[in-house]
Regions:
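A short, conserved beta-strand element in the Rossmann-like catalytic core
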Residues: 25-28, 113
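Short, flexible, basic/aromatic active-site loop/helix in glycosyltransferases
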Residues: 67-88
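Glycine-rich, basic loop-to-helix element that forms the pyrophosphate-binding segment
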Residues: 1-13
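Active-site acidic short loop of glycosyltransferases
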Residues: 13-16, 107
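Short beta-strand-to-loop acidic/aromatic patch adjacent to the donor-nucleotide binding site
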Residues: 16-26
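Active-site-adjacent helix/loop segment of glycosyltransferases
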Residues: 132-229
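Conserved donor NDP-sugar-binding/catalytic core segment of glycosyltransferases
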Residues: 30-64
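A short, conserved alpha-helix in the catalytic core of glycosyltransferases
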Residues: 89-97, 101-106, 112-139
Length: 230
C-alpha cells in the first residue's frame, strides 16, 4: 500500500526531513529558497503541505478541516488557504515530513487497505497526540498528468479508523474507549456480534496501551477546529 511504501522509505533515509511526492509531479527549483528551507527545517511540525496544482494549473484542495455532519465524521476541503494555517492531512500524501515525529506516531497503519482511511488514520491520530500539519504556500508542486480522486467509501478500513480515532474519550491525562461504545460500533459495523466484539476489544487494548499519548479526543478536537474557523 502507499502507506507501507512510505513507512519503508522513512526507515531507509538518513535525513530527518523527507519530501514525499509522486513521479508524475514537478517542482520548480525556483521555489527552493533559503527562506523556504529555513521554514521546512522547523522541528515542531509533523508535515509541511505544499500548494498543489493540476496539470492545467488549477488549485487543488490542500486545506482539509474535520467536522461532524448529522452525527457522522466528515472532511471539508478548500483549495484556498492562508500560509501556515493548519490542515488535517496532506493531499495525496504529498508533503515534507519530520521523520522522527512520523516514526513516533507509528507510521501508517498497514492493516488499512483503503488509501484514504490509511491517510486519515495517521492524520487524526497525529492531532489527537499533539502533532500538527501546516500549509506552506511557498512550496508549490504541480501534477504533470491526471490523477485519481480520493475514494472515501466507508469500508472495513473506516471501521478501524473509527475505533482508533473517533471512539476514544479523553479524561484528565489519558484516553480510553468506553465499553458502552461497543453497541454503537456493533450497529455501525454490520458485523456479527463475535467479530465486532473481537475488533472492538483489540481497539480498546490499543488505546489502553497508548492512553497517555493522547492529548485530546476527536469531539474536542473538531469543536476547537470549527471554532477557529467561524
Amino acid at each position: 500500500s502507499t502507506g507501507e511504501m512510505i513507512n519503508l522509505g522513512m526507515q531507509e533515509v538518513r535525513n530527518n526531513k523527507v519530501l514525499v511526492l509522486w513521479d508524475t509531479m514537478h517542482i520548480s527549483t525556483k521555489v527552493i529558497t533559503d527562506r523556504l528551507l529555513t521554514t521546512l527545517l522547523n522541528d515542531d511540525v509533523l508535515c509541511f503541505v505544499p500548494f498543489l496544482f493540476t496539470d492545467q494549473m488549477q488549485n487543488l484542495p490542500v486545506k482539509n478541516i474535520p467536522s461532524i455532519d448529522d452525527g457522522s465524521f466528515n472532511v471539508k476541503s478548500f483549495s484556498v488557504a492562508q500560509d501556515f494555517s493548519k490542515t488535517l492531512y496532506p493531499f495525496d500524501f504529498v508533503g515534507v515530513y519530520d521523520k522522527n515525529r512520523f516514526i513516533n506516531l507509528g507510521g501508517f497503519d498497514y492493516t488499512l487497505t483503503s488509501r484514504y482511511w490509511q491517510l486519515l488514520d495517521i492524520a487524526v491520530r497525529s492531532y489527537l497526540w499533539g502533532e500538527k500539519t501546516i500549509i506552506c504556500s511557498n512550496l508549490r508542486i504541480n501534477y504533470e498528468c491526471d490523477f485519481s480522486l480520493e475514494d472515501t467509501t466507508l469500508d472495513k478500513s473506516y471501521l478501524r479508523f473509527f475505533l482508533k480515532n473517533l471512539s476514544p474519550r479523553f479524561v484528565g491525562d489519558y484516553a480510553y474507549i468506553p465499553k458502552k461504545e461497543f453497541f454503537s460500533y456493533l450497529n455501525r459495523s454490520s458485523l456479527g456480534f463475535f467479530k465486532a466484539f473481537k475488533t472492538f476489544k483489540m481497539a480498546r487494548n490499543w488505546v489502553s496501551k497508548n492512553k497517555f499519548r493522547f492529548k485530546t479526543d476527536a469531539q474536542t478536537l473538531i469543536s476547537a477546529w470549527e471554532n477557529e474557523n467561524e
